[in-house]
């Protein structure tokens, strides 16, 4: 019986390789700016999520170093023991005030924040309605939760409306993303918020890719659509240039999560130095509008220079998908771009649907106009 696990592992790996969908990790020796270095070769990096360029900011690094000198390197315990310190409390308070919620609860990752909410909130007899293209963390939690999960067609308000009518007698949670990570498009949040209110359902929005980048002072997609969901997830690995996440909600829900969200209760709290640095990142997001302005300029340039390229999708975000179709063709293009010193990532099934493999280009405020032109020229020539 011990061999069953080995056989299962080998079979799964072989199937993935035979389908041309095997993934591998590459050691990046330098890579938190517009360029990265792999195996001694330098590339322009169009695969990261550091949209505002904060990950390489000297100002933010100094804030983290200041936090280390003040609070040490680790929290030493979970939040409900002795791991919750002044920097954590300050960051939660600042986030709640900025985004217009009663409270914020910190988590070590967006994945754990999403799963913690769904696992702790949903019970047998509840209905969970999710956009078909929601993140894997949300889908996995939904499938493993005791609730009945149904998926509505991507950004299809009409389909969501019909599902809400069928679940009107059960407690219902609707979950969508603000910006969809593989397509770079926005959710119709205003319409969805109206529907959930009309049907007495709760709305949860994962704004991992919108917070810091979109909206007034970087407040994200909910600000763009002038809504306040019941639960908002923000993450710190994209616009904030660091890592971690927070759940924003009303005070009663926050108290509930502090008691029953196991990812929060039973995990060592993020280092207080990290929370200190995140508070400074928040200040930079609020005050340094030039970063978002530059992203908009680069976005316009990218779309203009690829306007005749079939498969290049226009989006209002720094996520620019180029739909290729077959996974092997996407890999060929990505490899050809690497030969020219341009690092892009081929996104293949199961991350995206079959026959929709793509090159996922992401832009950063660290990029220059010349960087964008180098990429678009290569894509136009190779495509």
UniProtKB/Swiss-Prot annotation:
Cite the annotated pathway.
Answer: Cofactor biosynthesis; biotin biosynthesis
Return the broad EC class.
transferase
| Enzyme Commission number(s) | 2.3.1.47
Q: How the protein assembles, per its UniProt entry?
A: Homodimer.
Q: Which GO terms describe its biological process?
A: biotin biosynthetic process
Gene Ontology MF, one: pyridoxal phosphate binding
* Key word Isomerase present: no
Cited function: Catalyzes the decarboxylative condensation of pimeloyl-[acyl-carrier protein] and L-alanine to produce 8-amino-7-oxononanoate (AON), [acyl-carrier protein], and carbon dioxide.
> What species is given as this protein's source?
Aliivibrio fischeri (strain MJ11) (Vibrio fischeri)
Q: Which cysteines are joined by disulfide bonds?
A: none
Where substrate binds, per the record, is at: 23, 135, 351
Protein residues bound to pyridoxal 5'-phosphate? 110-111, 181, 209, 235
Presence of the UniProt keyword NAD in the record: no
What protein name does the entry list? 8-amino-7-oxononanoate synthase
